[in-house]
Amino acid sequence: MARCSNSMALLFSFGLLWLCSGVLGTDTEERLVEHLLDPSRYNKLIRPATNGSELVTVQLMVSLAQLISVHEREQIMTTNVWLTQEWEDYRLTWKPEDFDNMKKVRLPSKHIWLPDVVLYNNADGMYEVSFYSNAVVSYDGSIFWLPPAIYKSACKIEVKHFPFDQQNCTMKFRSWTYDRTEIDLVLKSDVASLDDFTPSGEWDIIALPGRRNENPDDSTYVDITYDFIIRRKPLFYTINLIIPCVLITSLAILVFYLPSDCGEKMTLCISVLLALTVFLLLISKIVPPTSLDVPLVGKYLMFTMVLVTFSIVTSVCVLNVHHRSPTTHTMAPWVKVVFLEKLPTLLFLQQPRHRCARQRLRLRRRQREREGAGTLFFREGPAADPCTCFVNPASMQGLAGAFQAEPAAAGLGRSMGPCSCGLREAVDGVRFIADHMRSEDDDQSVREDWKYVAMVIDRLFLWIFVFVCVFGTIGMFLQPLFQNYTATTFLHSDHSAPSSK
């Protein structure tokens, strides 16, 4: 029983001792805060300097937590950053032995003096941080303040290589009311911290260098600038924009492979042109309305639109050639040589067999006509008789001798006069039909030649269009691969324009 009472007394003593120590610790921190923020010795409106000429050195460092978005059209970058600020305040010092060896204390940031460091190139009017967190104060007067903030900063968007582009968006920090003679801003680190960074699905972080800028013409000017060098991830725009454009352009190639007789050449050309116009309107809603550069996708769309317009013009010319006839156009000899003999071989076109056979027959007939074979049916002249044009002359001579020998037969010969006129008319009709068929055959051959010329022109422009599209597409989209984007390049371009107040 005595042991139990002793144990209870021991536990009670330990509990009372722990409670007293906690109360004493709380009392110590409370006494320290009251000591530091005593209105009689501390005024948060006064700069922590012993005299007017003393500089207050403020160390800055940006920690990027998240790259929220980059709005290309409005040219605004939204980021979630932690702005580290460190300085010394001689009024917030104490001796640790007077306060139970307490070396650090956290004070509300709105109750102490703060350097009014703001984002100078903000785009929404929110210059200050969004949350005033507590400041960590050490016994030697050094203050560590890490407020989080969501900044919207102005960013000049370079659209030349969109969507394979890299951007340099800057964040410029400086004191709003204090100049260099009162506050000296220095970099705590040459690069921004990425220890707590959440990766973005649209951008890759290339480099985050920081620099301290001074103006030679103004000795009171100083700022801290961080360069956010970021590269776009092009997969989204490649799948949703570039590949559809390439496929639509490939449809324009089929215009030259489409037969002219189907009547859908112009319809296909106009449809492709309208589709490209829709994509061009989509691009205009994404990129900023600038006249300094044309985005890469916009250049490609304009390139394809020019090609499609060219295909429309060539299709009109091909259709015009396709529907020509001997009554409207005469085929020049050089057209026959170039488009019927030379180009088909170069373009790997094989002439149809029936066309070759018809051409051989036509050449053979013309050769016979030149040799006098046109007298196959009958000869014109005073001794020619239509009734005897298809009769063997030897038999005619024998028949004539028989008629002369017998007087009765002479009367029969005279009675055949009306028959002679009918036969002449029949022969004239046969000759007219033969001439008409020959003319129709010649006209049909000429029309077939014009159609073949149109097909050769179609095939010629097909190969030209294929080569121009392939090499033009490769040449345009290989440009971003040869661009040499480095942090030094961006920084050199920024240093070329000196900062000023």
Swiss-Prot record:
Its localization reads:
Synaptic cell membrane; Cell membrane
| Keyword list, A-Z | Cell membrane, Disulfide bond, Glycoprotein, Ion channel, Ion transport, Ligand-gated ion channel, Membrane, Receptor, Signal, Synapse, Transmembrane, Transmembrane helix, Transport
Instruction: Mention one GO molecular function.
Output: acetylcholine-gated monoatomic cation-selective channel activity
State which ranges are Cytoplasmic (membrane side). 260-267, 322-459
Sugar attachment sites are 51, 168
**Residue ranges crossing the lipid bilayer per the database entry:** 239-259, 268-288, 301-321, 460-480
- Specify whether DNA-binding is a keyword of the entry: no
Q: Where is this site: Key residue that may interfere with effective access of the conotoxin BuIA to the channel binding site?
A: 84
Q: Which SUPFAM superfamilies does its entry note? A: Neurotransmitter-gated ion-channel transmembrane pore, Nicotinic receptor ligand binding domain-like
Q: Where is this site: Key residue for a rapid dissociation (K(off)) from the conotoxin BuIA?
A: 136, 144
Q: Does the keyword Transmembrane helix apply?
A: yes
Q: How is its activity regulated?
A: Activated by a myriad of ligands such as acetylcholine, cytisine, nicotine, choline and epibatidine. Channel potentiation by calcium is stoichiometry-selective, CHRNA4:CHRNB2 nACh receptor is achieved by calcium association with topographically distinct sites framed by anionic residues within the CHRNA4 subunit and between the CHRNA4 and CHRNB2 subunits. Oligomeric amyloid-beta protein 42 activates specifially CHRNA7:CHRNB2 nAchRs. nAChR activity is inhibited by the antagonist alpha-conotoxins BuIA, PnIA, PnIC, GID and MII, small disulfide-constrained peptides from cone snails.
Its membrane topology, per UniProt?
Answer: Multi-pass membrane protein
- Residue ranges, Extracellular compartment? 26-238, 289-300
Which positions make up the signal peptide? 1-25
Known partners and oligomeric status: Neuronal AChR is a heteropentamer composed of two different types of subunits: alpha and beta. CHRNB2/Beta-2 subunit can be combined to CHRNA2/alpha-2, CHRNA3/alpha-3 or CHRNA4/alpha-4, CHRNA5/alpha-5, CHRNA6/alpha-6 and CHRNB3/beta-3 to give rise to functional receptors. CHRNA2:CHRNB2 and CHRNA4:CHRNB2 nAChR complexes exist in two subtypes: LS (low agonist sensitivity) with a (CHRNA2/4)3:(CHRNB2)2 and HS (high agonist sensitivity) with a (CHRNA2/4)2:(CHRNB2)3 stoichiometry; the subtypes differ in their subunit binding interfaces which are involved in ligand binding.
Biological role stated in the UniProt entry: Component of neuronal acetylcholine receptors (nAChRs) that function as pentameric, ligand-gated cation channels with high calcium permeability among other activities. nAChRs are excitatory neurotrasnmitter receptors formed by a collection of nAChR subunits known to mediate synaptic transmission in the nervous system and the neuromuscular junction. Each nAchR subunit confers differential attributes to channel properties, including activation, deactivation and desensitization kinetics, pH sensitivity, cation permeability, and binding to allosteric modulators.
Kindly provide the name given to this protein in its UniProt entry. Answer: Neuronal acetylcholine receptor subunit beta-2
Where does this protein come from, organism-wise?
Answer: Mus musculus (Mouse)
Q: Provide the taxonomic classification.
A: Eukaryota, Metazoa, Chordata, Craniata, Vertebrata
Q: Which gene encodes it?
A: Chrnb2
